[in-house]
């Protein structure tokens, strides 16, 4: 473990869970939800008492792919600017030359890339509530409350964090074998280990264990029933989340935080934080 | 109660009002139903740009309506609807599948109490007149009492108690509801006391039909408008997309012209015919576990699993410092997992490049099978001072791509890749029927052959970010370039032969299969030497022949020699 996280202190800070909840709720109210979802908020958030393990494995120069991506982008914007009569394809040397003409990022001494192993198998838990709304015949005519409790999050992955030309790249590279998590998987797998290998090889799953417990419906004046632990719904949500992460942040996809500020802003000092 | 109803809409009577309006409309729709159907017909006809005689339709339907016995003299008017207690809707079971055919299904219990419904209309009491009106002219005797006698009638349903278990299916197109176990009870009160028992009896009889047929279809039709927001526009968009699809299909349909036929290589045709004919035998050679197939360079379906298990993945990744020659890929775990061994981390034996290339390869292979994501998503989040603005675009792609749209590849191999993909998928589907015939274009045929046998990465799918440097290193390898000529364009036969031979020579003697050798994580693969397909020029046609290899077998497949006997 390269990073020492003082989790005890976090855990004992009783205000922390509350502030995190408030911050998240503030964010959730600010975003635009689809019309059939209403009242999305975090009801409870608990950090858990086990810290994540973060281990720094390598510090190297950034891989070429990041430079390629930046250059390609610069090229595109340059092409958009100089877009005129010429509109034929991307092939050939001509475009490359033009790219060099405009702007190209080369590896510099300040660029750095970290290969970090992240491991978490703690008891963080989040409770989210939302309402599915039927806007017919009048607005918010009928609502179905849903409560999700997410816990038992476990992952053990290698991530790539690179910083170059004022941009931060983050990508999950691959999963790492983990005795506890692997065992979890086989239990969760309904088809058993022999039948499960039907589909194509999964590149990465990032979140290896996750339990979602659902509550659909709400009692009203002590009347009616609440549907609990809807297995299919839980499975569905899990798959969606995994797919989303795999699509968005798993190599060769990545997230790119751009800290570059164009100079036409009032401030011309380049801040890097 | 699981579902929460908005109490306000019940308190301020708005719900009752809307329901009253809807009911009035619905009850009167029966009268104008025929006209409506006509409207729909003519509308559909107009859309289909076939001019149909609407007049004829109208007149015929009016006749049909006239010939029915209709005692209603005026529209049905719903006077009052009242739900003093809020209905109760409980969810009993829920099943989410996420498939477009059936997104979700659930079992619900509906109950409502004390509801009140009052309708008013006028009826014709002179039933003799009704008969006279519809009977043909030649009937006798002539009626003298042919005055109308209109009586207003009010029917009140009070104390409606409904309890029902319903199955609800949510689909992409709408909501389907079926009512099971309906128990309905109400007090019926009619302003004409004489008719009350009779009407009550008939009503109770027809209730079954209402819950079995009328309500579900009405609800389904209604729900269609929720799902498509505004029905008309969505209709057109689906039409549009369909048109688009058919246009695309038309675009990629292969047309074989005489010129193309000249390009067909006899060598390839021979090989393809061998391949098809070998399928017609019952040879069991290929089931031997050691070999992938009896035909070199091709993979038999029963060995597919064996083959895929040797694909590069992190579980059989041996670390960077291994000696390439010693590295024998072993069959990886059966659990279909791609995990980096922890020991490799502990020993700090990490070859970042190898991991990256393996992950990229697996990603690309996923594309070829799923066909959904073409380019990796690389979102850019611009961070300014305090506030974040999320630029919702996939990297450097043009800004007109919105977040939900599939990302198109922008790398230089774009054109080649996408077109080859589509061609491959299209021809693969038609392969079964046309396998024996030689009418389609050879290049596409052969590429579809390989892909139908093994869903490996699309061959033109160059690893996206390999670029200039690789090109230079490759130029030094003139032999590979020789064979590249074959892949990039179809030249005369002589060239093909030459490339065949040269590609044969470039094979390592221990690499039994060309494709297999590309897939396997040999040292060659891991080292930065690019694969052949990473520098195919984008706009050229190319083909991949899965049979370009023959080393240790007796029946060598050079052009000068005879083809192997059919197995």
Curated annotation (Swiss-Prot), chain A:
Keywords: Endoplasmic reticulum, Lipid transport, Lipid-binding, Membrane, Mitochondrion, Mitochondrion outer membrane, Transport. Component of the ERMES/MDM complex, which serves as a molecular tether to connect the endoplasmic reticulum (ER) and mitochondria. Components of this complex are involved in the control of mitochondrial shape and protein biogenesis, and function in nonvesicular lipid trafficking between the ER and mitochondria. MDM12 is required for the interaction of the ER-resident membrane protein MMM1 and the outer mitochondrial membrane-resident beta-barrel protein MDM10. One of its GO terms (biological process) is peroxisome organization. Belongs to the MDM12 family. The SMP-LTD domain is a barrel-like domain that can bind various types of glycerophospholipids in its interior and mediate their transfer between two adjacent bilayers. The keyword ATP-binding does not apply. Residues 78-90 have a biased composition (Acidic residues). One of its GO terms (cellular component) is endoplasmic reticulum membrane. This is Mitochondrial distribution and morphology protein 12. Coiled coil: none annotated. It is a peripheral membrane protein.
From Swiss-Prot, chain B:
Its main location: mitochondrion. Residues 392-416 have a biased composition (Polar residues). Residues 392-453 are annotated as: Disordered. GO terms for biological process: mitochondrial genome maintenance; mitochondrion-endoplasmic reticulum membrane tethering; phospholipid transport. One of its GO terms (cellular component) is ERMES complex. One of its GO terms (molecular function) is lipid binding. It is found in: Mitochondrion outer membrane. Keywords: Lipid transport, Lipid-binding, Membrane, Mitochondrion, Mitochondrion outer membrane, Transmembrane, Transmembrane beta strand, Transport. Residues 417-452 have a biased composition (Low complexity). Residues 1-224 form the SMP-LTD domain. PROSITE patterns: SMP. It is a multi-pass membrane protein. It comes from the Eukaryota. Lacks alpha-helical transmembrane segments, suggesting that it resides in the membrane via beta-sheet conformations similar to those predicted for other outer membrane proteins and porin. The SMP-LTD domain is a barrel-like domain that can bind various types of glycerophospholipids in its interior and mediate their transfer between two adjacent bilayers. Component of the ER-mitochondria encounter structure (ERMES) or MDM complex, composed of MMM1, MDM10, MDM12 and MDM34. Belongs to the MDM34 family. Component of the ERMES/MDM complex, which serves as a molecular tether to connect the endoplasmic reticulum (ER) and mitochondria. Components of this complex are involved in the control of mitochondrial shape and protein biogenesis, and function in nonvesicular lipid trafficking between the ER and mitochondria. MDM34 is required for the interaction of the ER-resident membrane protein MMM1 and the outer mitochondrial membrane-resident beta-barrel protein MDM10. This is Mitochondrial distribution and morphology protein 34. It comes from Vanderwaltozyma polyspora (strain ATCC 22028 / DSM 70294 / BCRC 21397 / CBS 2163 / NBRC 10782 / NRRL Y-8283 / UCD 57-17). The lineage of its organism: Eukaryota, Fungi, Dikarya, Ascomycota, Saccharomycotina.
């Amino acid at each position: 473990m390269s990073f020492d996280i003082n989790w005890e202190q976090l855990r004992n800070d009783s205000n922390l869970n509350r502030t995190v909840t408030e911050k998240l709720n503030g964010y959730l109210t600010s975003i635009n939800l689809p019309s059939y979802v209403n009242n999305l908020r975090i009801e409870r958030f608990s950090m858990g008492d086990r810290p994540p393990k973060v281990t720094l494995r390598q510090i190297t120069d950034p891989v070429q792919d990041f430079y390629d991506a930046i250059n390609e982008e610069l090229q595109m914007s340059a092409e958009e600017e100089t877009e005129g009569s010429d509109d034929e394809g991307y092939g050939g040397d001509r475009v490359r030359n033009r790219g060099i003409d405009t702007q190209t990022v080369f590896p510099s001494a300040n660029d750095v890339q970290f290969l970090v192993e992240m491991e978490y198998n703690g008891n963080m838990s989040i409770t989210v509530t939302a309402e599915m709304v039927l806007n017919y015949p009048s607005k918010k005519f009928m609502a179905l409350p849903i409560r999700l409790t997410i816990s038992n999050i476990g992952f053990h992955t290698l991530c790539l964090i690179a910083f170059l030309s004022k941009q931060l790249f983050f990508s999950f590279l691959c999963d790492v074998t983990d005795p506890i998590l692997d065992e979890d998987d086989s239990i969760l797998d309904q088809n058993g280990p022999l039948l499960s290998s039907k589909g194509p090889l999964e590149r990465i799953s990032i979140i290896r264990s996750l339990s979602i417990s659902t509550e659909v419906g709400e009692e009203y004046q002590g009347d009616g029933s609440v549907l609990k632990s809807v297995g299919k719904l839980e499975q569905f949500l899990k798959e969606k989340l995994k797919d989303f992460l795999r699509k968005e942040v798993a190599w060769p996809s990545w997230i790119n935080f751009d800290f570059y500020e164009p100079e036409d802003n009032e401030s011309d000092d380049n801040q890097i934080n | 109660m699981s579902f929460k109803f908005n109490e306000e809409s019940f308190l301020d009577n708005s719900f009752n009002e809307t329901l009253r309006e809807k009911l009035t409309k619905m009850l009167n729709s029966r009268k104008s139903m025929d006209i409506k159907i006509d409207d729909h017909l003519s509308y559909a006809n107009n859309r289909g740009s076939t001019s149909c005689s609407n007049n004829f339709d109208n007149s015929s339907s009016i006749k049909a309506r006239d010939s029915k016995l209709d005692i209603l003299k005026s529209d049905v008017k719903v006077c009052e609807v009242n739900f003093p207690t809020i209905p109760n809707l409980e969810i009993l079971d829920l099943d989410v599948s996420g498939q477009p055919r059936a997104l979700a299904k659930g079992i619900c219990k509906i109950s409502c109490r004390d509801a009140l419904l009052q309708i008013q209309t006028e009826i014709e009491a002179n039933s003799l007149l009704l008969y006279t009106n519809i009977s043909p002219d030649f009937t006798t005797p002539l009626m003298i009492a042919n005055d109308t006698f209109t009586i207003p009638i009010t029917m009140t349903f009070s104390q409606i108690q409904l309890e029902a278990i319903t199955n609800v299916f949510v689909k992409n197109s709408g909501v389907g509801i079926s009512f099971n176990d309906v128990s309905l009870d109400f007090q019926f009160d009619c302003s004409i006391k004489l008719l009350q028992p009779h009407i009550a009896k008939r009503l109770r009889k027809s209730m079954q039909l209402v819950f079995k047929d009328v309500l579900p279809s009405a609800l389904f039709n209604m729900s269609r408008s929720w799902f498509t927001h505004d029905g008309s526009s969505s209709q057109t968009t689906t039409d549009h997309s369909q048109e688009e699809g058919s246009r695309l299909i038309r675009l990629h349909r292969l047309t074989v012209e005489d010129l193309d036929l000249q390009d067909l290589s006899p060598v390839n045709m021979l090989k393809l015919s061998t391949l098809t004919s070998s399928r017609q035998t019952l040879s069991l050679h290929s089931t031997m576990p050691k070999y992938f197939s009896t035909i070199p360079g091709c993979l038999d379906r029963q060995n597919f699993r064996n083959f895929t298990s040797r694909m590069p993945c992190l579980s059989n990744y041996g670390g960077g410092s291994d000696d390439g020659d010693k590295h024998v890929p072993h069959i990886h775990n059966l659990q279909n997992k791609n995990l980096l061994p922890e020991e490799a981390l502990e020993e700090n034996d990490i070859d970042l490049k190898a991991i990256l290339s393996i992950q990229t390869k697996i990603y690309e292979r996923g594309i070829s099978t799923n066909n959904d994501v073409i380019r990796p998503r690389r979102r850019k989040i611009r961070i300014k001072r305090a506030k974040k603005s999320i630029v919702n675009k996939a990297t450097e792609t043009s800004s007109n791509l919105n977040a939900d749209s599939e990302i198109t590849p922008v790398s230089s191999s774009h054109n080649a890749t996408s077109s080859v993909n589509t061609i491959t998928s299209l021809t693969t589907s038609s392969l079964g029927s046309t396998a024996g015939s030689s009418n389609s274009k050879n290049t596409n045929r052969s590429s579809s052959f390989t892909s139908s046998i093994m869903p490996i990465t699309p061959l033109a799918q160059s690893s996206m970010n390999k670029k200039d440097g690789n090109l230079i290193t490759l130029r030094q390898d003139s032999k590979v370039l020789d064979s590249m000529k074959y892949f990039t364009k179809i030249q005369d036969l002589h060239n093909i032969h030459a490339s065949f031979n040269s590609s044969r020579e470039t094979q390592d003697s221990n690499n039994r299969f060309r494709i297999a050798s590309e897939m396997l994580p040999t040292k060659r693969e891991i080292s930065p030497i690019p694969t052949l397909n990473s520098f195919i020029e984008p706009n050229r046609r190319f083909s991949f022949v899965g049979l370009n290899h023959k080393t240790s077998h007796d029946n060598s497949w050079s052009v000068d020699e005879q083809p192997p006997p059919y197995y």
